[in-house]
C-alpha cells in the first residue's frame, strides 16, 4: 500500500510531538511554573486550522518582547537657590544705647550699623576725662590771677615767614579764594590766616590719634564717673565732689551726642568715611575746624562736586567764609566789626588779634 506524501507528513508530525513530550521527563525536567522561556528559543507551532497554504510548521520566537517604556517619575525641580542676606555687622554692646538713640532720631539702617560696628569695642576715656578735668579745676581750683600781661598774639604765629606761606597757599588755590571772596566778601588774606591759625593750612588736622567720630561717640556714652575711672585720680579731692561729677557728666554727654548725631548725618549725606575725619580733642574737623553741628548749616560746596568735604581747600575756604557772612561779614566792614565776627568763630580775643595781624602781613605781600 502506497503512502502519500501528505500522509507521511502527518506521521512525521506525530513522531515529533511524541519526542517533545518525552524530553522533559528524560532530562529530569519539571513543568515550568510560568511561561517564561529563555531568550532566543524557537518553538514550532501547529498549523492553523485552515492550513494557510503552508506546510503546517511555523516558527515563533519566544525571546523577550520589547519592554514597554517604564513610567518616568518626574523629577522635582530643585528649589530656587536663595542668596543668604548678609547679617548686619556686629555693634559692640557699649554702643548699643547710642545706636538706639540715633534710631529714635530717625538715623538707622545698614550704613549706620556699619559705622557703629567700625568703632573699637571700648570707648576712649580721654575726651570726657579731659573735659571734666578742665571744668573741675576751673570750678574748685581756679588759677590765681596773674600779674603778667596777657599775650596779644599766639606765640610764633605772626611772622613774615608764615605770611609768605599764606600768600603761597592763596596763589596755589587762587580759584577757591577768589570765588569765596566774590561770593561772601571775606578777604583772601583773612581766610588764609584763619586756616593757618586753625590747622597750619591743613598740615595739623588733629590733636589726638582718635578720629572725630570715635572721640564724640565715646563722650556721648560716658555718662557716669565710672566711665572716666582713669582720670578721677587726677582730680584733687574728687571723692568730695563726686555728686558734682555725676551731675555734670550727663550734660556733657548729651552735648556730645548732638555732635555725634550731626557727624553721622554728615558722613551719610556727604559720603565721608570716619577714617577721613581726624579731629580736635573735642571733635572739630576739617581745615577750618568746624564742629559737626555747624556743617549742615554753614558748610559750603566750594568745588561743585555736590558734597561738602572740609578737608578740601575749596570747601573749607567756602565754608569758613559762609560762616562769617552768615554772622554779618561783608565787604567794607570796619576792623572792629571784623574782629568781633572773628570772635564769633572762636570766642578768644587773642585768636581774633592773631588772625587780623597775620592777615595784615599777608595783604602786604601782594
Region spans (language model):
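Cell-wall glycan-active module
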Residues: 2-13, 20, 25-279, 283, ...
Amino acid at each position: 500500500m502506497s503512502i502519500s506524501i501528505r500522509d507521511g507528513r502527518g506521521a512525521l508530525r506525530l513522531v515529533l510531538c511524541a519526542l517533545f513530550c518525552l524530553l522533559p521527563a528524560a532530562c529530569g525536567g519539571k513543568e515550568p511554573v510560568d511561561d517564561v522561556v529563555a531568550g532566543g528559543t524557537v518553538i514550532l507551532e501547529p498549523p492553523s486550522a485552515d492550513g494557510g497554504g503552508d506546510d503546517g510548521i511555523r516558527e515563533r520566537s519566544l525571546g523577550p518582547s520589547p519592554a514597554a517604556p517604564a513610567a518616568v517619575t518626574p523629577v522635582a525641580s530643585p528649589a530656587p537657590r536663595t542668596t543668604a542676606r548678609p547679617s548686619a555687622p556686629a555693634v559692640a554692646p557699649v554702643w548699643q544705647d547710642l545706636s538706639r538713640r540715633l534710631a529714635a532720631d530717625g538715623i538707622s539702617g545698614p550704613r549706620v550699623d556699619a559705622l557703629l560696628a567700625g568703632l573699637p569695642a571700648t570707648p576712649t576715656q580721654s575726651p570726657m576725662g579731659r573735659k571734666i578735668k578742665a571744668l573741675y579745676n576751673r570750678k574748685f581750683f581756679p588759677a590765681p590771677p596773674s600779674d603778667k600781661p596777657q599775650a596779644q598774639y599766639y606765640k610764633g604765629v605772626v611772622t613774615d615767614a608764615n605770611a609768605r606761606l599764606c600768600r603761597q597757599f592763596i596763589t596755589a588755590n587762587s580759584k577757591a579764594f577768589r570765588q569765596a571772596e566774590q561770593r561772601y566778601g571775606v578777604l583772601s588774606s583773612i581766610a588764609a590766616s584763619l586756616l593757618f591759625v586753625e590747622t597750619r593750612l591743613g598740615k595739623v588736622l588733629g590733636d589726638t590719634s582718635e578720629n572725630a567720630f570715635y572721640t564724640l561717640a565715646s563722650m556721648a556714652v560716658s555718662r557716669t564717673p565710672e566711665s572716666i575711672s582713669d582720670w578721677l585720680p587726677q582730680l584733687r579731692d574728687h571723692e568730695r565732689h563726686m555728686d558734682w561729677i555725676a551731675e555734670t557728666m550727663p550734660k556733657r554727654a548729651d552735648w556730645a551726642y548732638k555732635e555725634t548725631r550731626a557727624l553721622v548725618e554728615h558722613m551719610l549725606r556727604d559720603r565721608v568715611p570716619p577714617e577721613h575725619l581726624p579731629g580736635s580733642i573735642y571733635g572739630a574737623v576739617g581745615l577750618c575746624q568746624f564742629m559737626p553741628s555747624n556743617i549742615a548749616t554753614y558748610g559750603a560746596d566750594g568745588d561743585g562736586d555736590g558734597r561738602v568735604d572740609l578737608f578740601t581747600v575749596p570747601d573749607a575756604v567756602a565754608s569758613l567764609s559762609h560762616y562769617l557772612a552768615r554772622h554779618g561779614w561783608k565787604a567794607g566792614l570796619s576792623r572792629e566789626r571784623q574782629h568781633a565776627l572773628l570772635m564769633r568763630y572762636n570766642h578768644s580775643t587773642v585768636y581774633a588779634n592773631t588772625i587780623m595781624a597775620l592777615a595784615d602781613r599777608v595783604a602786604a605781600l601782594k
